Amino acid sequence: MAYAIIETGGKQVRVEPGRFYDIELLSVEPDEKVTIDSVLLVQNDGEVTIGQPLVAGATVQGTVLRHLRGRKVLVYKMKPKKKTRKKRGHRQEITRLLIDSITLNGTVLTAPTATEETADATPDTETAAE
């Protein structure tokens, strides 16, 4: 299974092809393609490529699924014996991003197809009977 570690929105995220992730808001419309060049690490079939600080020639392609707001974070400030209370809430704007592929030096590492996933998930009848 191939994966990459990317930097977006001041955070580092471990991404795999075929999965979606909630990241900081991107100024891109839904259903548009996004290419992320800030790739810190790429792993494919046990071979790890680490950047210093970025991996040269590595990109991650994704599709923006939708924009949404995160859970509300409440901040409550109180000073005892003064009757001073402040309650504030904040909801972060986030983007749901589906990772299509990881590219390393022109080699595209894509998500496994549905037939491969179901073949791996079904147990072998010969080994299960023994």
Curated annotation (Swiss-Prot):
Q: Where is region (Disordered) located?
A: 110-130
- InterPro entries hit by this protein: bL21-like, bL21-like_sf, Ribosomal_bL21, Ribosomal_bL21_CS
Q: Where are the transmembrane segments?
A: none
Per its UniProt record, what Pfam families does this chain match? Ribosomal_L21p (PF00829)
What keywords would UniProt list here? Ribonucleoprotein, Ribosomal protein, RNA-binding, rRNA-binding
Does Ribonucleoprotein appear among the keywords? yes
Q: Some GO term, biological process aspect, for this entry: which one?
A: translation
Its cellular-component GO annotations read:
cytoplasm; ribonucleoprotein complex; ribosome
**Which GO molecular function annotations are given, in alphabetical order?**
rRNA binding; structural constituent of ribosome
Q: Does the keyword RNA-binding apply?
A: yes
Which PANTHER family does this one have? 50S RIBOSOMAL PROTEIN L21 (PTHR21349), LARGE RIBOSOMAL SUBUNIT PROTEIN BL21M (PTHR21349:SF0)
Function of this protein? This protein binds to 23S rRNA in the presence of protein L20.
Complex and partners: Part of the 50S ribosomal subunit. Contacts protein L20.
Membership in a protein family: Belongs to the bacterial ribosomal protein bL21 family.
Q: What is this protein called?
A: Large ribosomal subunit protein bL21
